[in-house]
Amino acid sequence: MTIPNDIRITPELVAAHGLKPDEYQRILDLIGREPTFTELGIFSAMWNEHCSYKSSKRWLRTLPTSGPQVIQGPGENAGVVDIGDGQCVVFKMESHNHPSYIEPYQGAATGVGGILRDVFTMGARPIAAMNALRFGAPDHPKTQHLVAGVVAGIGGYGNSFGVPTVGGEVNFDPRYNGNCLVNAFAAGLARTDGIFYSKAEGVGLPVVYLGAKTGRDGVGGATMASAEFDETIEEKRPTVQVGDPFTEKCLLEACLELMATGAVIAIQDMGAAGLTCSAVEMGAKGDLGIELDLDKVPVREERMSAYEMMLSESQERMLMVLRPEKEPEAEEIFRKWGLDFAIVGRTTDDLRFRILHGGEEVANLPIKELGDEAPEYDRPWAEPKMPPALDAATVPAADVADSLLKLLGSPDLSSRRWVWEQYDTLIQGNSLQIPGGDAGVVRVEDHPTKALAFSSDVTPRYCEADSFEGGKQAVAECWRNLTATGADPLAVTDNLNFGNPERPEIMGQFVRAIKGIGEACRALSFPIVSGNVSLYNETLGQAIPPTPTIAGVGLIPDWSKMARIAFAGEGQAILLAGAPESWGTHLGQSAYLRDVHGRAEGAPPPVDLAHEKRVGDFVRGVIRSGTVTAAHDCSDGGLAVALAEMAMASGIGARIDAPVNSASAAFFGEDQGRYVLTAALAREDAQLATLIEDARKAGVSLIAIGVTGGRELKLGEARAISVEELKEAHEGWFPRFMQDGSLQ
């Protein structure tokens, strides 16, 4: 059945499209009449949070987005950063949260597909992917189903397309029970003189539809992604898109081949709001109008209405403005790859967005007001109440060895091998470090020494306690993970996941997180070049923890000198960089406090950004000089977990000195800005004393805390734990949980 265009517009219909009464009045004032049903759908799609960023734009403008290496910042399909030698890295992270909760396999799969298109739309060949996943409590009846579906969807699409998944995160928390998070990242390589943009230029030029046919899948997807969930959630399943990675692979090859011919003036992938958003963005950015004839759009279903065709989010589709003389060559390329090619419209000089269907005009709207001049809100926000700092002395001592084993086998700190073994981590043949290290590392093809490092980070429990410090910490940990490989951190993309911005306390979390992120990015010269905001992550009024995911990219000039987390040999000195004399002090909001003592209290660890920069620059220097044989940052679980991960990665044990003060704080405190390093030096070696003195001159604490060797990890006076016992604790939880739902 075809949906007519002359449906009466009622307040109920307006509300069903996610538009507030004042927004609908603004539409009436803008166009001077009642909109058609298709026009209502177009406004609904373009003015929702997912497309317009109407609640967040005011604060996103405060973020640092430029730097000497930045070629393209926010506002395009992806960010672009120069890596020298005429090459650049193109990358972005984006959410597919709501679709993945409704239909986990397709929701996650199309999230991967969408972010890959964002990258190759810019003219880059994708070389790496990551994903940051948050699920509800392991004992929630839906969690196991969601984990299985999401991981299968990511693997199914990414593996088939042919991009290696080199990193990511998985967290569990009851606050995600009704709203999981799926944040997908992709990066690609391009030539700096071969970047393509979405800004249309020139009047009367053909607008060309490319790729797969249009169906009814995903109609209303962008609007669904801008709303809270309620008890009608299952009814939203038809709004989830269906992906085909093999078609996407053909689309990639066809686009890159066409780009090489010089035919492309502007290009935009059809993501959220499909044909509507892609056409509006191309025209609005270029100060041009766009006229589309829907009778020429390739469709795979009969009797599709204009409303459905304009709002369909069928996957693997592109919109381009082409040079007219190149049309035959362009069509030949796309036909060769088995893809549709259709001239569906033209650019105009009247700044109107005109839609024709069945010989009739079904929409005629001002294009700028739909696009870059959409509504913008300065929503009220409240300063959240900050928890007091936790006195570590109030935390009773627990057995260090038992505590370490419990942490290694906990849902949040256990091995993610079950997850990443379902992803192809080695395809393309350039992966130098796969998941399990501080950052994924991929060799830059056609260059003898360069590699790129990738990391994704945020600690939601820190953000819940103090989103300002949590925002700073997410940036700092990402910067630290890149540094720990020896990479120069270049730039980041963010994925800001929050609840309902109409609630001042939620908006307060968002604002403070933005302020923290901005402060950290400025201090660390780590600009934000792309990103995504996902709001209304709530179910029945229950918001997720604030989760501002930060994904960063770093450049390793010579990958033969990169550092890994595995102990490199026996008898090597173990050093702790950037730590206080007592090694660790901060137990507030720590994994140890939560998982061993069952307490979620205190302020998160503060981030001293000047200290972070000093320590990181020193660590990067000693990695590149060859002095350091292994490096690992200290994060969740503190020093003890970092040491255990280094031992498990190598099969080599270590003996660690007894700390001077509290063993709990020393081994499990989550003080920021710390790294564990090893050097092929004896404790009594004069070179080690020189290294420690060099650190002191650089304003960095460097403490010798132990030595590698044997097959056991002994932390101070605690009982020794064999590396095999560590691995058994670490590797067991996830497979048991996914096999039979075991929580032990």
Swiss-Prot record:
Residues noted as binding Mg(2+) 1 in the record, renumbered to the chain: 94, 532
Cell location: Cytoplasm
Residues annotated for ATP binding in this entry: 53, 92, 494, 531
Single biological process term from Gene Ontology: 'de novo' IMP biosynthetic process
Predominant cellular place of this UniProt entry's protein: cytoplasm
SUPFAM superfamilies: PurM C-terminal domain-like, PurM N-terminal domain-like
Role description: Part of the phosphoribosylformylglycinamidine synthase complex involved in the purines biosynthetic pathway. Catalyzes the ATP-dependent conversion of formylglycinamide ribonucleotide (FGAR) and glutamine to yield formylglycinamidine ribonucleotide (FGAM) and glutamate. The FGAM synthase complex is composed of three subunits. PurQ produces an ammonia molecule by converting glutamine to glutamate. PurL transfers the ammonia molecule to FGAR to form FGAM in an ATP-dependent manner.
The protein's name: Phosphoribosylformylglycinamidine synthase subunit PurL
Biological source species: Chelativorans sp. (strain BNC1)
